[in-house]
Amino acid sequence: MADQDNPVFQIQRVYLKDLSLEQPNSPAILLEQEQPNLDIQLGVEATPVGEGFFEVAVTATVQTKIKDKTMFLVEAKQAAIFEIRNVPEDQMGQIMGVVCPQIVYPYLRGNVADVINRAGFPPVHLGEINFQGMYEQQQAQAAGAAAPVTTQ
């Protein structure tokens, strides 16, 4: 019966939960010669979905603008279902806010780069993210909803 008390951490499934691409000013903006400005925002969400099962999602919003006109806007949410059992409660925040997002994020990066490339733009490669630092920053900001962290 000792196996029932052993910690369990397994990925059940990784999936693309949401993806949208908008090019509201095409085709005219495609003829612009000016260099666009890039804004990237990331967020992490964790939700229980059953006894010992959790969905962890990493979201990205990538927007490029020339002056005040949007060149393109990509919103993506990559998620995974994790089975997590028999883990001390004081470790769950770190697992949900650091370990799980580190597993999900590479899938998100690939999907975002792919959709931007397929839309006819040079790929935007999302950089590596320090989820530990992001988690610690959120913890320091207080007990509340996890605010998206902006990276550039």
From Swiss-Prot:
InterPro entries: SecB, SecB-like_sf. One of its GO terms (biological process) is protein folding. It is found in: Cytoplasm. It comes from the Bacteria. The keyword Transport applies. Its main location: cytoplasm. Homotetramer, a dimer of dimers. One homotetramer interacts with 1 SecA dimer. This is Protein-export protein SecB. The gene is secB.
